[in-house]
Amino acid sequence: MTDERSGRDIYGEAYEEANEPIFSGIPTFLKLPQVDRDQLADEDVDIGILGAPLDTATTIRPGTRYGPRAVRAASTVPSPPYQHFNIETGVDPFDTYSVADTGDAAVSPGDTRQSQLNIEDAVYEVSEQATPIVIGGDHSISYPDIKGWAEANGYEDIGLIHFDCHADTGDEGLTGFEYDHGAWVKRVYDDDLMAGENYTLIGPRGFWPGPDTYEEMREAGMKWYTAMEVAGMALDDIVADAVERATDGTDAVWVSFDVDVMEPAYAPGTGEPEPGGLVPREAIYMVREVVKALDPDDFGFDVVEVSPAYDASDTNSYNGGITSGFANRLIIEVMGSMALAEQGLEEGSPIKPKEPLGPSESTATPADDD
């Protein structure tokens, strides 16, 4: 990975041939090349996209098994592949990284635990050769995601930054099943992969888990910022604290984003919506700044709980919906921030107006009438 490359250098003829209509061709993520997981090194892939279509560990509304498909569909809409220059950050991740879609992990609707082990194996394969970005699936996939990623890289102590409406630290989840989507953080903690002091939760609200679980979290040194606290605080302060905690004495950092952290008006397509969540500008800004502050070579990311059956403007996932489109945007933002971190930059080369922001000198204002 060097900052001398361009998208054309990385993708060659595929870059030039990518501008086919969005409704044609193989619907990989962003219409990127599909590369078998055992071929990532041969193809010089830097970031591997992996689907984890598991939802049998959910507890309320199922449907996230279709999340990877919907996010891939949404990813074909905004702009041509390999061309994602961000006017705000001034970076196009495809000028820095070679990215490929590695398909989906094998899942069996009749065997939740075996499906999770299959996901762990698939993430391990990706992580041996590339940075994993995983699309869920319910939130139970994050435990095998982290297990496979850590084992492939020899990480013994990881930091975790967790965006979610729920803490997911239940000893036996929500149902008495220790591997359901409400227990994965506790599984990571119990495996001694993460110290409580290296964990930060952003956005919890509502009525689960109960006070006993939060007391245990506090005793373990875990920290959280509720959705209302996020709304009333400086986002940069939250980001700085979460990053400092996640990187203090750790080998690497995983960021996990559950779309139910969002206000349901902006992310209706999920299994357990809860009023009072984050708005997109808050979430995008914090994810952008968190990832930019981390080492892209010791990093992993997943976005989970996209359930397209409940989404707005999604009919059979032909082009995705509001929620799947938001998940797609997060992934592109993550890759853009990784590219900035790889280059050691706070920002790329955003294109600014000739005049500074604010009223032009010739513009009349109400004060001029006094």
Give the role of each language-model region.
Residues 2-370:
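Conserved alpha-helical scaffold segments that buttress catalytic/binding sites
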